[in-house]
Amino acid sequence: MKKRVLSLLLCFVLAAGLLSVCAPPAQAGTIADAFELFIKQPGQIKKLFNREVAHGDCGPAGDEASVHYKIYEVTNPTVVQDNPFLQQIWQIHDYREDAQYYGVYIFGDGKMADYAATGQKAPWMGNVEVTEYNDKGQVLGTTVVENLGEEYLALAYIADGTDEEWDGRTERYSGVTNVGAYAFKDCRYLTCMFLNDDITTISERAFYKDEYLSAINMPRKLELIDKYAFYGCDTLTFVRARNCSRLRRIEDHAFYSCTMLAELRLPEGLTYIGPWAFAWDRILGQEDTTLGLPSSLQTISTGAFAFVNHHKNLNIPANVTSIGDYAFMCDYYMNNLTFSPGDKKLTIGKAAFFGDNHMKSVDLSNRVAQIDRCAFAGCEMLEEAYFGDKIDTIEGRAFTSLDNAMKIAVEGVLNGILRPDDTEQNADQAGDISTALNMIAKVTKLKRAVFKNDPAKSICAAADSNRSFPDDCVVYYPQGSYTWLAELKDDGTWQGYKTGFWHGDHIAAFTDTVVAPTCTEQGYTLSLIHI
């Protein structure tokens, strides 16, 4: 029901063009300093571990005893005065002062187990037998806590090299190197998680739908964030991975629908962002309006940043060769889109920037070779676009509006990804959002398409219902382009579009009906414009 309400709210907001209503939580800025202290002093978590109530093994199959866990009673931070960060976090949520919460401490040598098999759960999940104590700390016996991980696990700590007591003796352990698949899935009250710096993998669905997960550090040796790892972590506010120099891949849906994620720091070395990885992180970028994509990045996959509303400035790095379908769809407040120069050709996918409503000009002259169908459809403020010598194909409706086929395609995609584990509500939600998209899928105000060199080899003509540009758009081409001159009509049109001459860096001549562009874009600026 919660997601349903959010979906409907978004639809009305989209229709009104008022996505600013999705403001960040008031606490986002106020807990930033405390979060830094938490990362620097992970012992804050261990201080809240009280009496041990259960323990066991959680190593991989065949080597279970290589990694161990201990479950502790947790001193409720709402009544502890020396832990301001956890007090702030816990006050946001509806923790009960009369409830007993728990923490899990994991230590050992190497990998912990994965729990992806059907019916398999981590030992701290489900019904757990724990030691029961009286008020004097004396053991009374045991009792079963139903759904301990799902309802009462509040803190977790995965240790690096450490000396720990096990089976009556102290042993040295080298450290745990991963977070197992599904290990903390659906831990609703898991608030703070510390990962040691030797962890290389955060596995599939490791923290899936941990609604209250507010603080987690990114290990320095991290190499992979697997699919759905942080899906639906609604109160996750910071992802600071800039020091994770070994991180290469963030897989599909990894941070999907982290609706309060306000700050994202990605490291140099990252090459791949998977499908829908950060989609629906609706306030991402409001704390810092520039999305800093690392220069090492090569692939931005389908829907990677769809419905992220606050990136005012976006630069596509020089090594990126593919921007997937819907990649930045409905990034409503995007003002400036730039492309770093380089030698690698770049393809922009279907509806990749659809509905990015605050761009007035876009310079695609650096590396852009193919612009797919509806790539910039619905960009209602867009007035001019510039193209370079790499451009080969501009597909139908690239700069106009969605057609019915594309609307159906978008709805079909949303139907498949909105709620992967709850298909019953998908169709309704997808339909609601599709209706909202129709409200902003209007023909753009684009008046100038300026080609720095020879125009695209493939383009949809103005008379075509799937025209690449609005039919009143003026297409400027280089003077002396024999290909164009041969195809130019007697009335001065090309493919049905009005035309003007372009000298490669300034306008040389215009027809009487053409208004001169401002010539202010990079690579086109000259002090003299001849009319």
Positions of predicted regions on the chain:
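Sec-dependent signal peptide cleavage junction
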Residues: L19-F35
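Disulfide-bonded cysteine-rich modules in secreted/extracellular proteins
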Residues: E52-P60, H503-Y524
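Positively charged n-region of N-terminal signal peptides that target proteins for export
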Residues: M1-V5
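Extracellular/surface-exposed low-complexity segments
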Residues: F35-K40, I45-N50, D57, R467-H506
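Structural signature of tandem-repeat unit edges
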Residues: V104-D109, N127-N178, R188-T201, E211-L224, ...
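Bacterial N-terminal signal peptides
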Residues: C11-S20
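Consensus positions within tandem repeat domains that build extended binding/scaffold surfaces
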Residues: G180-Y182, E204-A206, K227-A229, D252-A254, ...
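Conserved small/polar residues in nucleotide/adenosyl-binding loops
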Residues: H530-I531
